[in-house]
Amino acid sequence: MIRLLLAAAITAMSVLPAGAVWWLENDYSFGSNGLNRNSLTFFTIPARNLTAGLNAAFYKDSGVYDHKTFSFRVPMMYSGPRYSVSFKPFLYPVDGDTRSGAYGGKLFLLTSMSEEPDESYLRLSVSGAWARQKARVLAAGVLAPAKKSFTQSSAELQAEKSFYGQFYFLASAAAFSKPDGVSNATLVTPAMDQADLAYMGVFRQITALPDWIMTAQIARNMKPEYDSYIYAGYSKISYRRADKANSFTGGIKLNLNEKSNLDMAYNAYKEDSSSWKSYYKLLLQLFF
């Protein structure tokens, strides 16, 4: 199983170097509109089949999010022989610049439908997420004096197929609830990245309210010639009463040595009424 395909980190235990009991993961993205996004996660194994982590992240750009918006997560994961379960609570403290914040959590279940000796398999996953946001809103075109609190939820289904441990295919779909009393036209700088609710396939933050998302991904294992994977993906995002968006990703994951991996990727993103935007990602894993 390659971690670049699944959004959850619960499969990390299956690829840990021998003797590794904790590791660091730094995920950095940059690109159009001055995007600067960084996420640092510490993982450890406190008990057999159990992984726990601490994450701190921020994003900023040269637009309305021109100050760093911080967030924190505590991923907890159990991995068994036929299924894995992950729960990840998250928090966006109310920011002094955006005056927005959020908290919530995501529950993820992965199960194996078939496992073959030649490394072929079929795995299905289902996840649900919930969030409570607080943000400024417009009322009759004027900024309202009080912030608005609202609730979001999502449901996501993924299927991943491996052929001989060489080719991997993944398809996923997610649907989002309709929040009461707010819309993309009235929300002002909401803080929460929607990637905390479902896999988006985008390297930048997505704070607009989605309606649904569909994604497809493919990856190729380059072993034994090269100790790496190459991958590509596509996402279609439908925003609630707003333009739809298309997102393409492509990259390579390199095993630098027994103690480190490097993932380098490119993302092209376009909303229907906008021009193409380019984003780049560097993800480094260090095992100890």
Where would I find each of the regions flagged by the language model?
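Repeated loop/turn-to-beta-strand initiation elements of outer-membrane beta-barrel proteins
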Residues: W22-L24, R48-L54, G80-F87, S114-V126, ...
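Outer-membrane beta-barrel "beta-signal"
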Residues: L254, Y266, S275-F288
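Short glycine/proline- and aromatic-enriched beta-strand/turn motifs that initiate or cap beta-hairpins
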Residues: G19-T69, A131-A135
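Detector for outer-membrane/organellar transmembrane beta-barrel domains
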Residues: P117-I237
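Outer-membrane beta-barrel pore domains and translocons
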Residues: D27-N33, N55-D61, K88-V94, S125-Q133, ...
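Outer-membrane beta-barrel proteins
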Residues: L35, D61-H67, V85, G96-G101, ...
